[in-house]
Amino acid sequence: HRDFHVSNMMFYKNKIALIDSQDAVLGNPAYDLASLIDDVRIKTSNSFKSNILKVFLSKFKYKNESQFINDFEILSVLRNLKIIGIFTRLAKRDKKRKYLKLIPYAWKLIDNRIKNNPNFHDLKNFLQKNPRIKKI
């Protein structure tokens, strides 16, 4: 879907309906889940995020659950790095500074995903050695 987040969902006749789907594409289902669980605009606890992931995995049986979780974490990190770039561009080019306040939480979401996944070793080292966007 690529634009899958709580703001694009609504209840209609006791079911969840998706809106704003004109840019929908087929892709890894872990991307949409990452968009829902690690939404930079909605702060939730890590335990809440873990519970959502557990419920999702209990409903949809994946042959390789650990691969799905790895995909989920990678896609969450990629998505939030992209969001940081987009919010920075909006502030610099378009003078839309209201999104800058969300950047620290995007970094927190990234940190939460990379801290225990060995596949992020190089990224973790890179981020430790290089300054993060904090102020524009």
Which stretches of residues belong to each language-model region?
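Conserved short-loop catalytic and cofactor-binding motifs
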Residues: 21, 37-40, 72
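ATP/Mg2+ or Mg2+-diphosphate-binding catalytic cores
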Residues: 85-136
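All-alpha amphipathic helical-bundle segments outside canonical DNA-binding/catalytic cores
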Residues: 65-76
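Active-site acidic catalytic loop and adjacent metal/ATP-binding pocket
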Residues: 1-33, 43
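Active-site activation/catalytic loop segments of kinase-like enzymes and analogous catalytic loops
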Residues: 29-63, 77-94, 106-113
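Glycan-recognition and catalytic cores of secretory/periplasmic carbohydrate-active enzymes
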Residues: 6, 26-27, 50-54, 60, ...
